From Swiss-Prot:
Its EC number is 5.1.1.3. It is an enzyme of class 5 (isomerase). Pathway: Cell wall biogenesis; peptidoglycan biosynthesis. This is Glutamate racemase. It comes from Streptococcus suis (strain 05ZYH33). GO terms for molecular function: glutamate racemase activity. One of its GO terms (biological process) is cell wall organization. It comes from the Bacteria. Substrate binds at residues 10-11, 42-43, 74-75, 184-185. PANTHER family: GLUTAMATE RACEMASE (PTHR21198:SF2). Keywords: Cell shape, Cell wall biogenesis/degradation, Isomerase, Peptidoglycan synthesis. Provides the (R)-glutamate required for cell wall biosynthesis. It catalyses: L-glutamate = D-glutamate. The gene is murI.
C-alpha cells in the first residue's frame, strides 16, 4: 500500500479529462494536478521549450511527494516522456501508447485517424506506435491547432467551436472508422467531433485509456492507496487564473474543487 498521491501534468485543463476518468475508476486514489495554462498550448512551441516546461511541471510534482506521474498531455508525451521515464525512480505513464493500442482494437477497416497538436502530429509518434503493433493499419494524422485554445478559453460549446471543428475535420470525414483524440483537451469537444465525423466512427479517448493503465501499474508496483484511508484531498494547481481553471474544471468534472496559483 502507498497512500501518496498520483501526480498529473498537462499544458492546461485538458488533462482533467484523464483525472476525471481516474477519479471515476479509482475513487479511493488521491491526485495532485498541475496545469500550465499560462503557457498553453504547448503544440506550436519548439520541442526544446516543451521539454523545459515539462521538466518544470515534473519537478513541481516531485515536491508534492507523488508516487507516480501521469503525462496527461500528448504533446509532452511525444517530446519528453521517454526521457523523464528513464530518469525517475517512480512510474511515469504517458497517454499515447494506451490510445494507440485501443485504436488498433477498435478499428474494423484498418483505417485510423489521429487528431493532435502540431507537435504531436509532426512527431509522427501515433503512426509509429500504431504501426509497430499493427503494420497493416493505415494512419491518417491531422493537426488541429485551433482545438485546444477553444477549450482553454472555455469556448468548447460555442457556435465558433462547431464551425472550427467541422472545417478542420472535413479531410477525414468518410476516410476512417476510428479516430484517436490525440490531445487530452479534445474530449471536451467530443460531441461536436462525433457529429462532424458521423455516429458510426469510433472515438478513442487516449486519456481514458491511460486511466485504465494507471490501475494496472498501481497493482503491478503494489502502490495502491489503502481503501480504508478516507481522508482524500485532491489538489489542483495552475500557472494562470485559478478562477478560470476552476470554472472549466467544475463544469467538466461535476465536483467542487480548490485551485491554487503557482509560479514555475
Amino acid at each position: 500500500m502507498d497512500n501518496r498521491p498520483i501526480g498529473f501534468l498537462d499544458s492546461g485543463v485538458g488533462g482533467l479529462t484523464v483525472a476525471r476518468e481516474l477519479m471515476r475508476q479509482l475513487p479511493h486514489e488521491e491526485i495532485v494536478y498541475i496545469g500550465d495554462s499560462a503557457r498553453a498550448p504547448y503544440g506550436p512551441r519548439p520541442a526544446e521549450q516543451i521539454r523545459e516546461y515539462t521538466w518544470q511541471l515534473v519537478n513541481f510534482l516531485l515536491t508534492k511527494n507523488v508516487k507516480m506521474i501521469v503525462f496527461a498531455c500528448n504533446t509532452a508525451t511525444a517530446v519528453v516522456w521517454e526521457e523523464v521515464k528513464e530518469k525517475l525512480d517512480i512510474p511515469v505513464l504517458g497517454v499515447i501508447l494506451p490510445g494507440a493500442s485501443a485504436a488498433i482494437k477498435a478499428t474494423q477497416t484498418g483505417k485510423v485517424g489521429v487528431l493532435g497538436t502540431a507537435m504531436t502530429i509532426q512527431s509522427d509518434i501515433y503512426r509509429e506506435k500504431i504501426q509497430a503493433l499493427s503494420p497493416e493499419t493505415q494512419v491518417d494524422s491531422l493537426a488541429c491547432p485551433k482545438f485546444a485554445p477553444l477549450v482553454e478559453s472555455n469556448s468548447h460549446q460555442s457556435s465558433l467551436a462547431k464551425k472550427v471543428v467541422y472545417e478542420t475535420l472535413r479531410p477525414l470525414v468518410g476516410q476512417v472508422d476510428t479516430l484517436v483524440l490525440g490531445c487530452t483537451h479534445y474530449p471536451l469537444l467530443r460531441p461536436i467531433i462525433q457529429n462532424a465525423m458521423g455516429k458510426d466512427v469510433k472515438l478513442i479517448d487516449s486519456g481514458a485509456e491511460c486511466a485504465r493503465d494507471i490501475s494496472v501499474l498501481l497493482n503491478y508496483f503494489q502502490i495502491n492507496r489503502s481503501r480504508t484511508e478516507k481522508d482524500i484531498q485532491h489538489r489542483f494547481y495552475t500557472t494562470a487564473s485559478p478562477a478560470a481553471f476552476k470554472e472549466i474544471a467544475e463544469s467538466w468534472m461535476g465536483i467542487d474543487i480548490h485551485v491554487e496559483h503557482v509560479e514555475l
